[in-house]
């Protein structure tokens, strides 16, 4: 698979960076960056947290901080246009020596279109850089993705060269010592970051997601011609858009509101279903779906739900926030029509 999630128009939107943090100066492992070619119109900020009890304990919890809702209507036919990129939790290890955490408590990144995985850090706190890399000065900090990591005696800032094309990388085994991801040299022979005992580890990242509603109804609204889209693997699941577009069955409402779905890696989307909405070309009058009927999946609680950015048929966001961006072009949802997505 190529490194582009949106092969028809890979340079439509500016890059949205990945942000990885460890509280109280803890260290980060498995930090990733979104490749610049993987860009689309809608971005959803997703936050995960993981609690650790000690260097050899399994995580107490690993779940989303909140269960976001979605503007994705209830429909049986969905085509994936943009490849989701997800990351497992960052691994904050204890400041004691020895081997990394067991596989159950320390998992590498699940990343399919970029090559950044496990990093080796020196005895200092580490953080994700903003993409500004410099040459390694100590020579003891190397990454799996090449020369764009900056290292010195005070900090180790992993970053991935965004312009580089990476071959498809399968999901790594659930262990921190996967051979292909280990650095060639670690100072002191330890793969452990320095400060992390009893710390709360967090990994915050942006996730591009695009959906195109394709109806299963036979009544035509308008015929749309489109090109076959590349099948894109999401861990063990493969989502493919049919090579031809089916006729659409539409209702008549001035505003169409859809696009935006937070997805956890290798898990089903968590979203609210509304029994009053049609299952084909659903028209929404611009109202946010968040806080509606009871969620259809366990563990999804509407009180903690925050509506993501929704792009309406007029090309305007129906909700706002730091992770809410209007599309660069409104072709993906025109009022009353559905054109091919660029």
UniProtKB/Swiss-Prot annotation:
A Pfam family: Keratin_B2_2
Region (5 X 5 AA repeats of C-C-X(3)): 5-328
GO cellular component labels: cytosol; keratin filament
Assigned keywords, A-Z: Keratin, Repeat
Keyword Repeat: yes
Transmembrane segments: none
Sequence repeat placement: 5-9, 91-95, 239-243, 309-313, 324-328
Similarity-based family: Belongs to the KRTAP type 10 family.
UniProt name for this protein: Keratin-associated protein 29-1
Lineage of the species this protein comes from: Eukaryota, Metazoa, Chordata, Craniata, Vertebrata
Gene this chain is encoded by: Krtap29-1
């Amino acid at each position: 698979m190529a490194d582009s999630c949106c092969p028809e128009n890979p340079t439509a939107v500016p890059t949205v960076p990945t942000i990885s943090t460890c509280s109280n100066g803890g260290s980060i492992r498995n930090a990733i960056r979104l490749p610049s070619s993987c860009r689309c119109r809608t971005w959803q900020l997703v936050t995960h947290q993981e609690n650790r009890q000690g260097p050899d304990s399994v995580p107490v919890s690993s779940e989303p901080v909140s269960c976001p809702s979605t503007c994705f209507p209830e429909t049986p036919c969905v085509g994936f246009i943009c490849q989701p990129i997800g990351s497992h939790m960052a691994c904050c290890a204890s400041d004691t020596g020895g081997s990394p955490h067991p596989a159950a408590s320390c998992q590498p990144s699940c990343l399919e279109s970029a090559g950044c995985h496990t990093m080796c850090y020196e005895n200092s706190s580490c953080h994700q850089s903003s993409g500004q890399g410099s040459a390694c000065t100590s020579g003891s900090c190397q990454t799996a993705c090449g020369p764009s990591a900056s290292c010195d005696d005070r900090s180790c800032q992993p970053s991935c060269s965004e312009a580089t094309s990476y071959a498809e990388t399968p999901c790594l085994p659930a262990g921190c010592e996967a051979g292909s991801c280990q650095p060639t040299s670690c100072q002191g022979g330890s793969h452990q970051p320095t400060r992390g005992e009893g710390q709360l580890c967090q990994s915050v990242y942006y996730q591009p997601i695009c959906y195109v509603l394709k109806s299963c109804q036979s009544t035509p609204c308008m015929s749309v011609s489109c090109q076959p889209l590349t099948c894109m693997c999401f861990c063990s699941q493969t989502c493919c858009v049919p090579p031809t577009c089916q006729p659409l069955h539409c209702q008549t409402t001035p505003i169409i509101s859809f696009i935006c779905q937070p997805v956890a890696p290798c898990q089903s989307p968590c979203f609210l279903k509304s029994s009053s909405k049609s299952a084909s070309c659903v028209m929404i009058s611009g109202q946010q779906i968040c806080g509606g009927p009871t969620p259809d999946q366990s563990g999804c609680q509407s009180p903690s739900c925050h509506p993501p950015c929704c792009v309406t048929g007029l090309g305007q966001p129906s909700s706002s926030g730091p992770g809410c961006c209007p599309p660069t072009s409104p072709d993906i949802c025109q009022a009353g029509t559905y054109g091919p997505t660029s």
